[in-house]
Amino acid sequence: MQRNLVVLLFLGMVALSSCGLREKHVQKLVKYAVPVGTLRTILQTVVHKVGKTQFGCPAYQGYCDDHCQDIKKEEGFCHGFKCKCGIPMGF
């Protein structure tokens, strides 16, 4: 039961954040909806990481390249959760 509630809350937050709500609004929802503890910390971390993701780069690497081709005519590289145009990964 508790696991189902967590999954439902998480999916609800993802849906809300994808329809134009900013990260701080979703964080406030987590703060009031989830009791203090490890679960709240985990959900806040997940919301923060999802909020920082640009152009779906971890899920679909080609999207970042398409974005950079459109705006700068350069090759796009996924650096963690951010797209960088013309800056290759330097390991």
Swiss-Prot record:
Localization, UniProt: Secreted
Record keywords, A-Z: Disulfide bond, Ion channel impairing toxin, Neurotoxin, Potassium channel impairing toxin, Secreted, Signal, Toxin, Voltage-gated potassium channel impairing toxin
Propeptide regions on this chain: 20-27
Domain of life according to the entry: Eukaryota
GO cellular-component term (any): extracellular region
Signal sequence extent: 1-19
Tissue: Expressed by the venom gland.
Span of domain BetaSPN-type CS-alpha/beta: 54-91
Disulphide bond pairs: 57-78, 64-83, 68-85
Record-level Gene Ontology MF annotations: potassium channel regulator activity; toxin activity
Assembly and binders: Monomer (both chains).
Family under the similarity heading: Belongs to the long chain scorpion toxin family. Class 1 subfamily.
Protein name as annotated: Potassium channel toxin AaTXK-beta
Species: Androctonus australis
